[in-house]
């Protein structure tokens, strides 16, 4: 490796070729070795290889332990390639031919004290046969040295190895200071083992540094050059570093020194190099660095003093410190400032662009630029960023929440499922419990009647439909409540749906066991008890009574309760969602749905108290003003839209339309419906999926259902917080002709067949047709119920505690009819599903605040519940095969094949 230990500079940057092998001639353009008598290698100077092989003088003292063993082999190989034997000596060329050239020494390490140079290097040098800027060290045969010869004139292709070219006057100053800096530089040279490191990076700002810049981080700033190492050069981090030889720039051979883009080195800086960090990388990524200060390359460096280099923050703009963020577009102020600055500096930007293009030409062989940014102008990108707007995802009609937009459900909700039940009717055929009150001496039974409900709130009872005068009539009051529906024994066929209308009064009572407490208990007095075997009539009557109770006018306040003081004041809010819909048979997609939310209030407040109720209404988002103690905890962050709101008579509707706050004077010790409204279903799927298939083969009918929990439902995602479905009912409608096949005789009369877990339905006797139906379930029970005219598959809790949430459950029924004539031409093509879920909400409606005027110690409670009732389409598979040609053992296989082809989990 050629080092700077034996460098001999020429006068006015003449070309000098240095060769450390005395037996062979070398090219030179001048013999001015006497100007640098002290630039020879010292015994303490260590030598290192940077990927080039150089000849080491046989008489010089070299104590470097990295090149001592192979120096003899390098001398023999390179000397033979540098000068072939028998080449005649030629006189040196004229010195005037290279007077405008610069001698550049590619070395960023300190120069150490050197030993006397070899005089025979210049005396035996061969002249150049052909001038070449990129490869001036031609031998006598006119060929460029090979890559293995590593002449000092070989240009470098590494853009990250900075170097400086030293003039003749610079070398004289170095000779004067070499006595003081030789010791330190010789010791520090071992730290710079290579100018190419694989695990580090070269900062881009190094190109714009001046030579006179002070040390950064305790190390001197490296000089800058445009010289580049060839791509074949490899570096070993374990080698010992040594100064690099001077390298010429291959760009502009005819450019005078004054026009060069490489700044001169100050006279007082070349001899005082100190230890610096290793360069980090050979490849520079221009896309990750700051802009180059091109103007600094053409500036004449100051000899006396230089401004220190400081690292600036590229993201800090001092002119924008007082600019406040814009609520519309936070980037507008920045873009306006940038445009103003760009207009003021249009001339300087043009000059900088031309200089930047020149650098791109310099490094285009080593760096590839991405031109994709040129396809779009800067002004277009700025305009697009200016048009950015921060949208509220919960804004009415926002595209981010299509489920909240009621426009998307207008067609589906035009005739919502279950709307026929709430339509006004002339009356309902019902059953009356006679006698109305229990009596030990007599039994009670059900008697048929006809019930009417007037607009004024009167309930009229008739013996038969069509009579003019009712036998009994009573008025509905605000203290009346409807009991929970239940099933009660009716006759030998089954049970009946029953309900009560009670007069309820709440009283405050003290309890001492197990600890003193105050409770508000309800005392119920039955007014009437009605029942029916028609489930649709039963639901329609309940909805009609609920609507009439809500529309009752609020009479004057009872003065007897105004002065009543409660020991504990409390208010309870019950939020109940009622979901009804139609679900497809294949993928269980919701085709139609209707969600009705009812809010009931029960309060025990002393005196006349005005209350405010706040919901998660989208129209009040960001405008809520409530006290801290009035905020109620919620489990949802969703905002909903309220549609078709209806209020009780105690609510001030004008205040609601103006501020969307529900202001009301609650009824004292009375549970009443405060308001109701419609919303959009907040989930994508239902809690579980149900798929049902039917196979009819002559006189044999098979029905099978698969039930599985849905992972898309929000309450099923976390097994630890999963909310179960309670009182699950799956009803399969049965034609009246098939009812006899689900009954069996017993000691007390006929009973319905019942299937339980791991036990199929057993039959005590054969039916009329001589065949027996079979029912099997993997969870819950299944039996025919006359109250629903259906086979009801009941499950108390879903998912089951003893099974995984994703485990499917199955219902199977096999019915053998007397003949295929018993198969009706058409029957129900859907399955009814009904269940309840506590502590959940189908509409995601939540109470955000409850405020009571002038009261802070009121206990507040909020309860949530949801009731689901929907229909699932029944998938029918008809296999009309001749009965004599089908063996009974093949029916399960045919049914299984049909199921697999139609349903896939």
From Swiss-Prot:
> Where in the cell does this protein reside?
Cytoplasm; Membrane; Synapse, Synaptosome
GO CC, any one term:
cytosol
Q: How is it modified after translation?
A: Phosphorylated in vitro by PKD.
- Residues in domain MHD? 568-878
Q: Does the keyword NADP apply?
A: no
Q: Where is this region: Disordered?
A: 1-121, 178-205, 244-263
The protein's matches in Gene3D superfamilies, at most eight in alphabetical order, are given as: Mu homology domain, subdomain B
Q: Which InterPro entries match?
A: Adaptor_comp_med_subunit, AP2_Mu_C_sf, MHD, SHD_dom, STON2_MHD, Stonin, Stonin2_N
- Short sequence motif NPF 1: positions: 313-315
Where Phosphoserine occurs, residue numbers?
Answer: 281, 287, 302, 762
Q: Which PROSITE patterns match?
A: MHD, SHD
The UniProt entry annotates the motif NPF 2 at 329-331
Q: Which domain of life is it from?
A: Eukaryota
Bias-annotated ranges (Low complexity): 40-50
Comp. bias (Polar residues): 178-196
Tissue specificity note: Ubiquitous.
Q: Which GO terms describe its molecular function?
A: clathrin adaptor activity
Modification sites for Phosphothreonine: 255
The free-text function statement in the UniProt record for this protein reads:
Adapter protein involved in endocytic machinery. Involved in the synaptic vesicle recycling. May facilitate clathrin-coated vesicle uncoating.
Q: How does the record comment on the protein's domains?
A: The Asn-Pro-Phe (NPF) motifs, which are found in proteins involved in the endocytic pathway, mediate the interaction with the EH domain of SYT1, SYT2, EPS15, EPS15R and ITSN1.
**Protein family per UniProt:** Belongs to the Stoned B family.
Q: Describe its assembly.
A: Interacts with the second C2 domain of synaptotagmins SYT1 and SYT2. Interacts with EPS15, EPS15R and ITSN1. Interacts indirectly with the AP-2 adapter complex. Interacts with TOR1A and COPS4; the interaction controls STON2 protein stability.
Q: What is this protein called?
A: Stonin-2
Origin organism is: Homo sapiens (Human)
Species classification: Eukaryota, Metazoa, Chordata, Craniata, Vertebrata
């Amino acid at each position: 490796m050629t080092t700077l230990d034996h460098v001999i500079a020429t006068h006015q940057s003449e070309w000098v070729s240095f060769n450390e092998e005395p037996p062979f001639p070398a090219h030179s353009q001048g013999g001015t070795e006497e100007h640098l008598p002290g630039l020879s290698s010292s015994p303490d100077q260590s030598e290192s290889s940077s990927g080039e092989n150089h000849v080491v003088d046989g008489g010089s003292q070299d104590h470097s332990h990295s090149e001592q063993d192979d120096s003899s082999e390098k001398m023999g190989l390179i000397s033979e390639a540098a000068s072939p034997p028998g080449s005649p000596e030629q006189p040196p060329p004229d010195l005037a031919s290279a007077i405008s050239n610069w001698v550049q020494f590619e070395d960023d390490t300190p120069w150490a004290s050197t030993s006397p140079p070899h005089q025979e290097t210049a005396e035996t040098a061969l002249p150049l046969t052909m001038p070449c800027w990129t490869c001036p060290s031609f031998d006598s045969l006119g060929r460029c040295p090979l890559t293995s010869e590593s002449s000092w004139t070989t240009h470098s292709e590494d853009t990250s190895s900075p170097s400086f070219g030293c003039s003749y006057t610079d070398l004289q100053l170095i000779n004067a200071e070499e006595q003081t800096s030789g010791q330190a530089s010789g010791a520090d040279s071992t730290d710079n083992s290579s100018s190419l490191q694989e695990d580090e990076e070269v900062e881009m700002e190094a190109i714009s540094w001046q030579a006179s810049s002070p040390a950064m981080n305790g190390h001197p700033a490296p000089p800058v050059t445009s010289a580049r190492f060839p791509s074949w050069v490899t570096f070993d981090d374990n080698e010992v570093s040594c100064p690099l030889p001077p390298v010429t720039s291959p760009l502009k051979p005819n450019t005078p020194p004054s026009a060069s883009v490489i700044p001169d080195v100050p006279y007082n800086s070349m001899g005082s190099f100190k230890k610096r960090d290793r360069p980090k990388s050979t490849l520079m990524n221009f896309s990750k660095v700051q802009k180059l200060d091109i103007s600094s390359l053409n500036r004449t460096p100051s000899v006396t003093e230089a401004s220190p280099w400081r690292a600036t923050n590229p993201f800090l703009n001092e002119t924008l410190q007082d600019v406040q963020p814009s609520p519309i577009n936070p980037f507008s102020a920045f873009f306006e400032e940038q445009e103003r600055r760009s207009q003021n500096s249009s001339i300087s930007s043009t000059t900088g662009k031309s200089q930047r293009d020149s650098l791109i030409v310099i490094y285009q062989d080593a760096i590839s630029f991405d031109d994709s940014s040129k396809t779009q102008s800067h002004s277009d990108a700025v305009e697009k960023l200016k048009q950015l707007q921060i949208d509220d995802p919960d804004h009415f009609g926002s595209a981010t929440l299509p489920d909240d937009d009621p426009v998307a459900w207008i067609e589906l909700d035009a005739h919502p499922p279950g709307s026929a039940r709430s339509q006004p009717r002339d009356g309902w055929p019902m059953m009356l419990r006679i006698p109305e009150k229990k009596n030990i001496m007599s039994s009670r039974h059900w008697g048929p009647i006809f019930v009417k409900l007037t607009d004024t709130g009167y309930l009229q009872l008739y013996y038969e439909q069509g009579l003019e005068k009712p036998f009994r009539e009573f008025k509905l009051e605000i203290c009346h409540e409807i009991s929970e529906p239940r099933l009660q024994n009716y006759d030998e066929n089954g049970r009946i749906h029953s309900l009560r209308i009670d007069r309820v009064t709440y009283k405050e009572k003290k309890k001492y066991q197990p600890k003193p407490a105050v409770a508000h208990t309800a005392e119920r007095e039955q007014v009437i008890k009605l029942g029916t075997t028609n489930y649709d009539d039963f639901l329609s009557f309940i909805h009609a009574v609920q609507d009439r109770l809500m529309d009752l006018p609020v009479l004057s306040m009872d003065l007897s309760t105004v002065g009543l003081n409660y020991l504990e004041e409390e208010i309870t809010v019950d939020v109940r969602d009622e979901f009804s819909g139609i679900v497809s048979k294949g993928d269980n997609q919701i085709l139609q749905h209707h969600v009705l939310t009812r809010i009931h209030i029960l309060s025990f407040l002393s005196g006349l108290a005005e209350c405010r109720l706040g919901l998660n209404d989208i129209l009040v988002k960001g405008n809520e003003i409530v006290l801290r103690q009035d905020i109620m905890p919620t489990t949802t962050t969703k905002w909903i839209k309220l549609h078709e709101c209806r209020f009780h008579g105690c609510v001030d509707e004008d205040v609601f339309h103006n501020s969307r706050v529900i202001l009301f004077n609650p009824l004292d010790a009375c549970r009443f419906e405060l308001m109701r409204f419609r919303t959009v279903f907040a989930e994508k799927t239902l809690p579980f999926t149900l798929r049902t298939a039917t196979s009819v083969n002559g006189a044999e009918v098979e029905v099978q259902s698969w039930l599985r929990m849905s992972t898309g439902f929000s309450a099923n995602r976390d097994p630890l917080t999963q909310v179960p479905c309670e009182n699950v009912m799956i009803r399969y409608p049965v034609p009246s002709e098939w009812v006899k096949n689900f009954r069996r005789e017993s000691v007390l009369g006929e009973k319905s067949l019942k299937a339980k877990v791991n036990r199929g339905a057993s039959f005590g006797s054969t039916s009329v047709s001589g065949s027996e139906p079979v029912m099997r379930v993997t969870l819950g029970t299944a039996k025919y119920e006359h109250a629903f005219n259906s086979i009801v598959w009941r499950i108390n809790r879903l998912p089951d505690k003893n099974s995984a949430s994703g485990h499917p459950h199955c219902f199977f029924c096999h019915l053998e009819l007397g003949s295929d004539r018993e198969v009706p031409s058409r029957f129900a093509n859907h399955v009814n599903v009904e269940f309840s879920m506590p502590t959940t909400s189908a509409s995601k409606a939540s109470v955000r605040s409850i405020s009571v005027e002038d009261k802070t110690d009121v206990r507040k409670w909020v309860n949530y519940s949801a009731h689901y009732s929907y229909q699932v389409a029944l998938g029918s598979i008809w296999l009309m095969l001749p009965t004599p040609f089908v063996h009974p053992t093949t029916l399960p296989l045919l049914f299984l094949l049909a199921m697999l082809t139609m349903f896939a989990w």
